[in-house]
Structure formats: structure tokens, C-alpha cells
């Protein structure tokens, strides 16, 4: 900031810049010195300390002054110092020096950069220059300043970066790349973009044209791991082996314990060792041959105990497999993929491609590469009543093997027997034909059974007193099996399924069954009949039935049982027809009176008995049973469970008659009960009168005792009455006195409590008012104090913003301007006056200038 002082004292090691306003040339004045400013000079700033560069420091000065060979400052013809514009000068430790006009301290005092060991500065030349050795350096050249040392900066050199040495540990390597053609630390020439590894352990400082890509860690190899590598281009490794582009190989612990991948090696992965136990083997696909190439399409079988690494391109067919250890009940079905011979020299067996054979245990077997294991077979254990279906693949014949453990030969397979869906459902239901015969046919089992093994012989347990018919479709004959028995099906046999009627009334095909129950049993049916007088009735009849079979060993007689597929529906229809015909010839009244006899004779028929009637004719007699000769079904009895009219009016009339009969019976029973009740009432009344007399006598005795006790109590009462009255009066007076005293005491306590409460309330009110007034006063004091602080701070900030120099300039601006105006006129005069004519010297200058006392020119008239 320029100063207007005429006398400027410059301390030691300080300087100022003085501007000559006539020539516009600035110069430097260096202290210690007292400088008297001339009128045509202007001091540009107050004294400033010289620039002092301590040891091991430097600064950069822009636009430095030019010096001659004796380091003297050069001046131009105007006296202005000569500057090297757009140039820089780096100044090291020296005596304090001033900055000449035009010089700028571009970089302040800065310590010199110390380059530590294993560190270097990457330098780049900005201009052409010659170094200390006289070598010419071209702009753009790059080199390293390696430590330890102190770097002296140069204006022609730029520090690009600081390079740190990379520490290479054991089992590590540093991957480098050349940024341009150069020689590495070992003196080997490198081309632009070339990459290589530095494997030496220790700190490595890359050269100027070497770029550090990364630090490569070695892969530690063990006896159980190998490194899978692939060549990215043709190169020769450290062991001198030449690798072609795309070639793959393994590095194991036999080659090296720690392998650092080269720049031209791609790590595909770590291959674990394949270990085969004494009971293991494996099949290697595309094995590597002696020439180091994969034999595509070939196989090699390796049996344990052995450990090896899979070479590149090799793979296991199905991993590590167990050796087939066959017991006496096991076998292997083999298939030849290529012609081969097996066995010893004397017992060699030749197999052509596609041949199948079976080997049996006990033995250990490892299949060769020319053999395929089709399947491992196990002997199937069969109980006496179990079996399997076996089919010969050559002849196609199917047979059943039952009751012995069996192993399939090479030409046999298990055959699945298909059954109709209805038969499958009946077999899977698992219902007991006897115990579950009353359940509905649509009922499902609680837990569905597992699906049937179709290769197993189909078996069915025929319950007691039941029969099952099996039909052989190849032989076209049927056989009947009576229970209890276990029936098994041959491959060509099927069950005869019975489709029976069920429900009330009977519905055809409502129930299906595999076995026929021979009875005795019953079934119920509902039929509708019509009498001769056209009364329609609905009957519910139950029939007991059974099958009569004279000789079970006779196939023809046994086949009669299944001659009628729906014996239930057939029998119910026949019996219903007979009943309808018999009832149609009688009236409702006759049928109502003799329904059981009419139905029995209709169902069983009748025969002439030996009894004769009044006219000498033989009387008919009902038979004991009804026989159906088609299948030997015998109906032994009939039960009329209900008879209901179908017509509503008939049903109402019948109901009224029944109600009338019930009312008559009820009235008779009511009269008898009434008579019995009257008799019992008379007996009870007599007992009651007797009891009353006894009670009256007992009451008289009690009254006598009561009167005696009352007399005694009156005597006692008369003596104690006066005493009790006196005591009660005294007690009342005592209680009344105590109550008055207590009441007065309580009133006094209440008055004291009220007085204390009122005093406390007034005290609290006064305290709160005092606190409120004090708080208001404190707020007003705080407000006034804060306003005073604000005004003081405002005045202080205004004075600081203007500065003391500005305030002084404002104060002396008027007088100084007047003095300068008078000086500019160059007047020199003397004024003589007496004491009677006073002169205002303060306004003299304004008068001379033609201005008023306020400094303004007078208005023109």
C-alpha cells in the first residue's frame, strides 16, 4: 500500500520501491536508511523485509533482473532495471536480497527435496539445455534422480513423480513393461510394450521407461496340487523348455516348489491330485500319449492304489468309481464295445462287439476300456408265496418264477404285468371282503397304499368261504380257487371281476369285487307293490342267502358260481317279481292282515301238505327256501322290515287308524292308572291324618315348656331392667362429653390448618411475583447490554473497515487540498493589518480562490 509520509525510515534488511512520477521509473531503496521522499516521488509500499533463503531451501523468482558477469544488475536507458520477462530464476541459500520492481516471488521459501534411498525422482526436460557435465539435454528427455541425495531444482526440469522402490519378497516377482525402447537394469534391450519379470529378492527401483504392472505371487505347489498353465505365445521358460502358443501343461512339485507364472503363461487353475484307493478305479477320456498330445476318442483304465494328475485335455468319464466287489448273490451284465479276449491263456474267451454276458460273484472286477457295464444285478430273494415275471429277450417267452431266490441271466429281463384299472384299484384298496363288505363302494382307504410292483407276481388272498375265478386267455380256460387260499396269476391269467348291484333299491354295477362270498349273508331291497284294490305299498325286505355247492373239486359245478355276473341284482329282480304277482291278487285289508305269510309264500313258493281242509282238499304249505339253479343261490329266509303306503291319502288313513288304536289303548291304560292313583291317595290320606294327631300332641308338650320358660324370663327381666337402664344413661353421658371435647379439638386443628394454608398460599404468590419481576429486570438489563455490545461492535467494525489511514485522510483532506491549491498558484505575498480589523485566516484561502466559507464558489448574480 502506498504511503504519503515524507520521511520513511527503512530498517536493516528491509526495502521499499520508489516511483518517480516524472519519469515513471521505479527503483529500490535498501535499509538501513532514512529516506526523504521528494515531491515527484511516490513510495509504493511500506518497508518490506528482504527475501531470506535459509540453507537447504530455495525459492523461485519470476521475471528476474538481468545481471552482468560481475553479478551486477543491468539497467536500461531510462534507469529501469532490465528484467528477463517470462523467465524464472531459482535462488538457493544466500544473503537476504530485495525484489526489484517487476520481480515476483512465484514460489515461496521451500525446503529442498531430499531423495531417500530406494527412491528416485522422475525428471523431464522442459527446455533444451546443457547439464553440468556439458552434455546437451533435449526438451522431452526423461531420466531418474536416484537417492540418497538432495535434489537441486532447475528451471528447465520438471519433476514428474516420485518413484518408490518395490520390495520383492521370497516367492514373488515384479512384472514390468517397457514404455519405449530401453535397456533394463541388467543391460538387456527391451522394445516398447515388452513385458518381463524381475525375480531377484530385494528392493527394485524401476528405470525411467519401466512401468510396474503388478507384483506377482508365486503359486506354492504341494504333492497334492499342480498348476495348469497355457502359453500365450511362443517362448522358452526358465528350464529351457520351448512352449508353443496355446500349448497347455502342468507344473508339479517335482518341477518346482513355488512357481511364479511368466508373462507369457496364463494360469488356468490348480489341478488337485487324483488318488485311487485299493478298491477304486477310473476311466480317463482322451488320455495323453507318449508324444505329449491327447489321443482323442481313446480311453484308459487306471486301477488303484495310485495317485496322479490329470493332464490338460484329460477328463474322467464318471469320476472315481468303486471296484465292483460281487458277492455270491450278485452279478454284472457286461457288453463288449470292441472285439476282445478275456481269461487266461488256456481259458481265453473271445467276445465280439455288442456281445452281452453275465459274470457272477464272488469276485472283484474292474471293467476294461472295451467293456461297458450295463447293470449290476442282484439275486431276487423269493419266499414260497412270492414270485417274479421273467421274459426271455431272445424268444419273448414270459414265465413266472415262484418260491426260490433267482438271478436273471444275460438274456432275461423283468417283465411288467399290466392289469385292468378296475383290478388295480381293487388290489390297492386293501379292503377285507368279509369285514368291509358293509361299507360303500366309493369309500377310500385312510392311507393309500404304495403303487404295485408290476414285475412281482400278482397274488390275492381269498378269504374263508369265498371263491375267486381266474381266466387264462391263452389256454382259454378258467379255474376257481376257494378260500382260505393265496391265488397267484400266471403271465396270461386275469381275475374275473364281479359287478354287483347295491343300494336300496338295488342299482346295477354299484359294487365291484374280485372274490365271491359263499354266504350265509343277507341283502336288503326296497320294492313297490300294488294290491287288488290299487293300494300302492313300499316294502323293505331282507333276504338271507348262501350258495350250495356239492362238490368243490368239480370244475363244472364250481364254474356255475360265476355263471351269473350279478347274482344280487338277478335274485332281487326275481323275488320282487314274485312278490308283486302275489300281492296283486289280494286286497289291502287282506295283505295288511297276512302280509308276512303272503310274502313268504310268494318268495319261497308252496307245496301241498298232508293236511286237508273241511272239504277234504289238501292245504298248501310254504317251502323253507328258494333255490336259483343257474348258480346254486339259495334264499333261506325273508324279513319284512317295513311296509309303507306310497299314496299319501292311504298313508294318512293308515296313520289315523293307527293313532285311533293308540288312543284306545292309551285311554284304557289311563283309566287303570287313575284307579290305582285314587287307591294310593286314600292310603296316603289315612297316614296323613294319623301323623297330624301325633304332631298336635307333641305341639302341646312344647307349648307347656314354652310357658314355663317365659315365666322364668319375665322374672329375670324385671330385676335386670333398672340396672341396665342406669348403666346405659351413664355411658351415654360419658360418650357425649368425650364427643364434645373431641369436636372442639378437631375444630381448632381445622382452623390452624386453614390459617397455615392461607399463609403458605400468600407466601407462594409473593415469591412468584418477585421471581417474575426479577426475570423481567434481568431480561431488560440483558437486552440493553446486548444492544450496547452491538453498537460497540458496529462502530469497531466500521473503524476497522475504514482503517486509521482512511479516517486520518478524511480528517485532513480539506486543509491539505487548500494548501496544495495555494502551492499550485505559486503566490508569495505579505499581509499587514492592524488589530482593529481582524482577518479570518481560516477562510483566507477560500477567499483567494474565490470560494465561499463552505468551499463552494459563490452564485453568479
From Swiss-Prot:
Sites bearing N-acetylalanine, chain numbering: 2
Query: PTM per UniProt?
Result: Phosphorylated on Tyr residues after EGF stimulation.
Q: Which cysteines does the record link by disulfide bonds? A: none
Q: Name one GO molecular function term.
A: protein phosphatase binding
* Family annotation (Pfam families): MVP_shoulder (PF11978), Vault (PF01505), Vault_2 (PF17794), Vault_3 (PF17795), Vault_4 (PF17796)
Asked whether the keyword Ribonucleoprotein is assigned, the reply is yes
Q: Where in the cell is it found?
A: Cytoplasm; Nucleus
- What's in the GO CC field? cytoplasm; cytoskeleton; nucleus; perinuclear region of cytoplasm; ribonucleoprotein complex
The biological processes this protein is annotated with in GO are: cell population proliferation; ERBB signaling pathway; negative regulation of epidermal growth factor receptor signaling pathway; protein activation cascade
The record's annotation in InterPro entries points to: Band_7/SPFH_dom_sf, MVP, MVP_rep_dom, MVP_rep_sf, MVP_shoulder, Vault_2, Vault_2_sf, Vault_3
* Major localization listed first in the record, in broad terms: cytoplasm
Q: Which residues carry this modification: Phosphoserine?
A: 421
Q: According to its UniProt entry, what is the function of this protein?
A: Required for normal vault structure. Vaults are multi-subunit structures that may act as scaffolds for proteins involved in signal transduction. Vaults may also play a role in nucleo-cytoplasmic transport. Down-regulates IFNG-mediated STAT1 signaling and subsequent activation of JAK. Down-regulates SRC activity and signaling through MAP kinases.
Protein name in UniProt: Major vault protein
User: Which organism is this protein's natural source?
Assistant: Rattus norvegicus
Taxonomy of the source species: Eukaryota, Metazoa, Chordata, Craniata, Vertebrata
Gene label: Mvp
Amino acid at each position: 500500500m502506498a504511503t504519503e509520509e515524507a520521511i520513511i525510515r527503512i530498517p536493516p534488511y528491509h526495502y521499499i520501491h520508489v516511483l518517480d512520477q516524472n519519469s515513471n521509473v521505479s527503483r529500490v531503496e535498501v535499509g538501513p536508511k532514512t529516506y526523504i521522499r521528494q515531491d515527484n516521488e511516490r513510495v509504493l509500499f511500506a518497508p518490506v523485509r528482504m527475501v531470506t533463503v535459509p540453507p537447504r531451501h530455495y525459492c523461485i523468482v519470476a521475471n528476474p533482473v538481468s545481471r552482468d558477469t560481475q553479478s551486477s544488475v543491468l539497467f536500461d536507458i531510462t534507469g529501469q532495471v532490465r528484467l528477463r520477462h517470462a523467465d524464472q530464476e531459482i535462488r538457493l541459500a544466500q544473503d537476504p536480497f530485495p525484489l526489484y520492481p517487476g520481480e515476483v516471488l512465484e514460489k515461496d521459501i521451500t525446503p529442498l527435496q531430499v531423495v531417500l534411498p530406494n527412491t528416485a525422482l522422475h525428471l523431464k526436460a522442459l527446455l533444451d539445455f546443457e547439464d553440468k557435465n556439458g552434455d546437451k539435454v533435449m526438451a522431452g528427455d526423461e531420466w531418474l534422480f536416484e537417492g540418497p541425495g538432495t535434489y537441486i531444482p532447475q528451471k528447465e526440469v520438471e519433476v514428474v513423480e516420485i518413484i518408490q522402490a518395490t520390495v520383492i519378497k521370497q516367492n514373488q516377482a515384479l512384472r514390468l513393461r517397457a514404455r519405449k525402447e530401453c535397456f533394463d537394469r541388467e543391460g538387456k534391450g527391451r522394445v516398447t510394450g515388452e513385458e518381463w519379470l524381475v525375480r531377484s529378492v530385494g528392493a527394485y527401483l524401476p528405470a525411467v521407461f519401466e512401468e510396474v504392472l503388478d507384483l506377482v505371487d508365486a503359486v506354492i505347489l504341494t504333492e497334492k496340487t499342480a498348476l495348469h498353465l497355457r502359453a500365450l505365445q511362443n517362448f522358452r521358460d526358465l528350464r529351457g523348455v520351448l512352449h508353443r502358443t496355446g500349448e497347455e501343461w502342468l507344473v508339479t512339485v517335482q518341477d518346482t516348489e513355488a512357481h511364479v507364472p511368466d508373462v507369457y503363461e496364463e494360469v488356468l487353475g490348480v489341478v488337485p491330485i487324483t488318488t485311487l484307493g485299493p478298491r477304486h478305479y477310473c476311466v480317463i477320456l482322451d488320455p495323453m500319449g507318449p508324444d505329449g498330445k491327447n489321443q482323442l476318442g481313446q480311453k484308459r483304465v487306471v486301477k488303484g492304489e495310485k495317485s496322479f494328475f490329470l493332464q490338460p485335455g484329460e477328463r474322467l468319464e464318471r469320476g472315481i468309481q468303486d471296484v465292483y466287489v460281487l458277492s455270491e448273490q450278485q452279478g454284472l451284465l457286461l457288453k463288449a464295445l470292441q472285439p476282445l479276449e478275456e481269461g487266461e491263456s488256456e481259458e481265453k474267451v473271445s467276445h465280439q462287439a455288442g456281445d452281452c454276458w453275465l459274470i457272477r460273484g464272488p469276485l472283484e472286477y474292474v471293467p476294461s476300456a472295451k467293456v461297458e457295464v450295463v447293470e449290476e444285478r442282484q439275486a431276487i430273494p423269493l419266499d414260497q408265496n412270492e414270485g417274479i415275471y421273467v421274459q426271455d429277450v431272445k424268444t419273448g417267452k414270459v414265465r413266472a418264477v415262484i418260491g426260490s431266490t433267482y438271478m436273471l441271466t444275460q438274456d432275461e429281463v423283468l417283465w411288467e404285468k399290466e392289469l385292468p384299472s378296475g383290478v388295480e384299484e381293487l388290489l390297492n384298496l386293501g379292503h377285507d371282503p368279509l369285514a368291509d363288505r358293509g361299507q360303500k363302494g366309493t369309500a377310500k382307504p385312510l392311507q393309500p397304499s404304495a403303487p404295485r410292483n408290476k414285475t412281482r407276481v400278482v397274488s390275492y388272498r381269498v378269504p374263508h368261504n369265498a371263491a375267486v375265478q381266474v381266466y387264462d386267455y391263452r389256454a382259454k380256460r378258467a379255474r376257481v380257487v376257494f378260500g382260505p387260499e393265496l391265488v397267484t396269476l400266471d403271465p396270461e391269467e386275469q381275475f374275473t371281476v364281479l359287478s354287483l348291484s347295491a343300494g336300496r333299491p338295488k342299482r346295477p354295477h354299484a359294487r365291484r369285487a374280485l372274490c365271491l362270498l359263499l354266504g350265509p349273508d343277507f341283502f336288503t331291497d326296497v320294492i313297490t307293490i300294488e294290491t287288488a284294490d290299487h293300494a300302492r305299498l313300499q316294502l323293505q325286505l331282507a333276504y338271507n342267502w348262501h350258495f350250495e355247492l356239492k362238490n368243490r373239486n368239480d370244475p363244472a359245478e364250481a364254474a356255475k358260481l360265476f355263471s351269473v355276473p350279478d347274482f344280487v341284482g338277478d335274485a332281487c329282480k326275481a323275488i320282487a317279481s314274485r312278490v308283486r304277482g302275489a300281492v296283486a291278487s289280494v286286497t289291502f285289508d287282506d295283505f295288511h292282515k297276512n302280509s308276512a305269510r303272503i310274502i313268504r309264500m310268494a318268495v319261497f313258493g308252496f307245496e301241498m301238505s298232508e293236511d286237508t281242509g273241511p272239504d277234504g282238499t289238501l292245504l298248501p304249505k310254504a317251502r323253507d327256501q328258494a333255490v336259483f339253479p343257474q348258480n346254486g343261490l339259495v334264499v333261506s329266509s325273508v324279513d319284512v322290515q317295513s311296509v309303507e303306503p306310497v299314496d299319501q291319502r292311504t298313508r294318512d288313513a293308515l296313520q289315523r287308524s293307527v293313532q285311533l288304536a293308540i288312543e284306545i289303548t292309551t285311554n284304557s291304560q289311563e283309566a287303570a292308572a287313575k284307579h290305582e292313583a285314587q287307591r294310593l291317595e286314600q292310603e296316603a290320606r289315612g297316614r296323613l291324618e294319623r301323623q297330624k294327631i301325633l304332631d298336635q300332641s307333641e305341639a302341646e308338650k312344647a307349648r307347656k315348656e314354652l310357658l314355663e320358660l317365659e315365666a322364668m324370663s319375665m322374672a329375670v327381666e324385671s330385676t335386670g331392667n333398672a340396672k341396665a337402664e342406669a348403666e346405659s344413661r351413664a355411658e351415654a353421658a360419658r360418650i357425649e362429653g368425650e364427643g364434645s371435647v373431641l369436636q372442639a379439638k378437631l375444630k381448632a386443628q381445622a382452623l390452624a390448618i386453614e390459617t397455615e394454608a392461607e399463609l403458605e398460599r400468600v407466601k407462594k404468590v409473593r415469591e412468584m411475583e418477585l421471581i417474575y419481576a426479577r426475570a423481567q429486570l434481568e431480561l431488560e438489563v440483558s437486552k440493553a447490554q446486548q444492544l450496547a455490545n452491538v453498537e460497540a461492535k458496529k462502530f469497531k467494525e466500521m473503524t476497522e473497515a475504514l482503517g486509521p489511514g482512511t479516517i486520518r485522510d478524511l480528517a485532513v483532506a480539506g486543509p491539505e487540498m487548500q494548501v496544495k491549491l495555494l502551492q499550485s498558484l505559486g503566490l508569495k505575498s505579505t499581509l499587514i493589518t492592524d488589530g482593529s480589523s481582524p482577518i479570518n485566516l481560516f477562510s483566507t484561502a477560500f477567499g483567494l480562490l474565490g470560494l465561499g466559507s463552505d468551499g463552494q464558489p459563490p452564485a453568479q448574480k
